[in-house]
Swiss-Prot record:
Protein's name according to its UniProt entry: Alpha-glucosidase
EC number(s) recorded for this UniProt protein: 3.2.1.20
Domain of life: Eukaryota
MF term (GO), any: glucan 1,4-alpha-maltotriohydrolase activity
Organism: Candida albicans (Yeast)
Keywords, comma-separated and alphabetical: Glycosidase, Hydrolase, Maltose metabolism
């Protein structure tokens, strides 16, 4: 069995500050709002809070465009508020980790302002600048065909010095040049040591596989012939110096007992293990996207093909097994700030099955091996935004840019309206904004998130789905999560560290698996992921004792729609 560590046993609750809780009536969530709910967070059974970017920022990409690592976005609060949050978490036995956004900064960061000021500036080489390509007519073009994750070219021309800078994300997010040692040292001091010295317990490391770019900056292979700019992951992910950089960064954190989890994304098992093998001393663990990107093209989230339950099992198997038999560690998550809501994506958000399928997903997730991550609102079953919302309600730069590019490309086609409807269907299913609507605290106006109209529209179903109503209801999804997290905490060897065995893998309606650990009874979990009754046939021998289920009636012979059962078998 894997060596026990606090960060392996952590249950992490992710907070997206803008949409969590507004304390001062400006319509935007803030740090004092978070502090006011720490008792609620502790009551869930979580052990760690992950706070998404709260640094000073122009907010072009919701704080992933940092203008000052050593300060706080004014609408969220102050450095003093952060000190209070750190102390408030620690007083309740909670750890606090921050988002570490160091692949890029904002164009408003003082480093970039200096870098762009002249070709001779000492910080010029802290970012990635290249001269234009000039065609036979003397026209300027980007240095290569690399595409941005947020549509269009990954290069932006800067008139002042006549060169392009690289931005793998938005134009306002220039990539830092990790090849420059002075730049790296500044990152470590400003973004890492500053916060660890304040008492923060670690980091979720954003875009952790992107720091080392191949220095030839060649054109990327053409993956989408209908698009001028191409996905360029092969030249900026898992690059030649990436592990050198991570080892160097880990040395900076070594004096502190930190938890680090990397967002690396699409990697082979061999590539992934290099980041999180204990022997390599880089990161504790990483997020793999097998589950949350099911049915989508990882290079283009809105090219969607759908999936079935067997596909989901394959993704969970792949994600769970990658660390088995190694000294690495895995993570378990099904929602975050970049993904759609799990009930809408993997369950059934109709009024009839919403709560049942939410409990089914909860049981599945809370029984998986690895460090468990839960996203704000997931514990009450918040859903995707209604399909009836117009595109104007979406705030995310990723969606806005994609929709704009789509309209420019197809807007004059005779069948544009049909194409647009199909795109909006997919946007509604997968857009990041689904996770970014305000947390639904009560059935009061604005869902108890704020006393004024929030920065983003509250989901229309807040009167049916909210913390206040579920808190005192023993049969609610919220209290089902509490029961599951209590079980997970009491039986760590089984649920956190145990071995998962899939049973009847090809069944397209039932998800059945066992969890085993030395010295523990076998846990047998069976979940009906369909909207119809399915016959129940025990797949392992022994005496079955029902521990937890999401339905009131006791039917041993069949599972009703979205019924989930946990047995102990001896």
């Amino acid at each position: 069995m894997s060596e026990h560590k606090w960060w392996k046993e952590a249950v992490v609750y992710q907070i997206w500050p803008a949409s969590y809780k507004d304390s001062n009536g400006d319509g935007v969530g803030d740090i004092p709002g978070i502090i006011s709910t720490l008792d609620y967070i502790a009551s869930l059974g979580v052990t760690t809070v992950w706070l998404s970017p709260m640094y000073d920022s122009p907010q072009d990409d919701m704080g992933y465009d940092v203008s000052d690592y050593e300060n706080v976005y004014s609408k969220y609060g102050t450095l003093q508020d952060m000190d209070r949050l750190i102390a408030g978490c620690h007083d309740r036995g909670l750890k606090l980790i921050l988002d570490l956004v160091i692949n890029h900064t904002s164009v408003e960061h003082k480093w970039f302002k200096e870098s762009r000021s002249s070709k001779d500036n000492p910080k010029r080489d802290w970012y990635i600048w290249k001269p234009p390509r000039i065609d036979s007519n003397g026209n300027k073009h980007p240095p290569n065909n690399w595409g941005s994750y947020f549509s269009g070219s990954a290069w932006k021309y800067d008139e002042l010095t006549g060169e392009y800078y690289l931005h793998l994300f938005a134009e306002s997010q220039p990539d830092l040049n990790w090849e420059n040692k002075e730049c790296r040292e500044a990152i470590y001091n400003s973004a890492i040591k500053f916060w660890l010295d304040k008492g923060v317990d670690g980091f979720r490391i954003d875009t952790a596989g992107m720091y080392s770019k191949y220095q030839h900056f060649k054109d990327a292979p053409v993956a989408f012939p209908d698009t001028e700019f191409q996905p360029c992951e092969i030249y900026h992910k898992n690059g030649p110096r990436i592990h050198e950089f991570h080892k160097e960064m880990a040395k900076v954190m070594e004096p502190y007992d930190t938890m680090t989890v990397g967002e690396v994304g699409h990697s082979t098992r061999e590539q992934a293990l290099k980041y999180v093998s204990a022997a390599e001393k880089e990161m504790n663990m990483m997020f793999l996207f097998d589950v949350v990107e099911l049915g989508s093209d990882p290079r283009d989230r809105f090219r969607y093909n759908g999936f079935d339950l067997v596909d989901l099992k394959k993704a969970i198997k792949s994600q769970g097994e990658f660390a088995e038999g190694t000294d690495a560690w895995s993570t378990v998550f099904i929602e975050n700030h970049d993904q759609a809501r799990a009930i809408s994506r993997f369950g059934n958000d109709s009024p009839e099955f919403r709560v049942l399928s939410g409990k089914a997903i909860a049981m599945l997730q809370c029984c998986l091996t690895g460090t468990l991550f839960i996203y704000q609102g997931q514990e009450i079953g918040m859903t995707n935004v209604p399909r009836s919302w117009p595109i104007e309600e979406y705030k995310d730069i990723n969606t806005i840019n994609y929709y704009r590019a789509f309209k420019e490309k197809y807007g004059k086609d005779a069948d544009y309206k049909q194409k647009e409807e199909k795109l909006v269907d997919v946007i509604n299913r997968l857009a990041r904004d689904n996770a970014r609507t305000p947390v639904q605290w009560s059935h009061q106006q604005y869902a108890g998130f704020s006393e004024v109209e929030p920065w983003m529209r509250v989901n229309d179903n807040y009167k049916e789905i909210n913390v206040e109503d579920q808190d005192g209801d023993d049969h609610s999804l919220l209290n089902f999560y509490r029961k599951l997290l209590k079980l997970r905490g009491e039986y760590k060897d089984l649920f956190v560290y145990g071995e998962m065995k899939f049973l009847d893998f090809d069944d397209k309606k039932l998800f059945t698996f066992a969890k085993e650990a030395p010295g523990s009874p076998v846990a047998y979990i069976v979940i009906n992921f369909s909207g119809e009754d399915v016959k129940f046939e025990p797949l392992i021998k022994g005496n079955y004792k029902l521990v937890l289920t999401n339905v009131d009636k006791d039917s041993k012979d069949a599972l009703s729609p979205y019924e989930a059962r946990m047995y102990v078998v001896d």
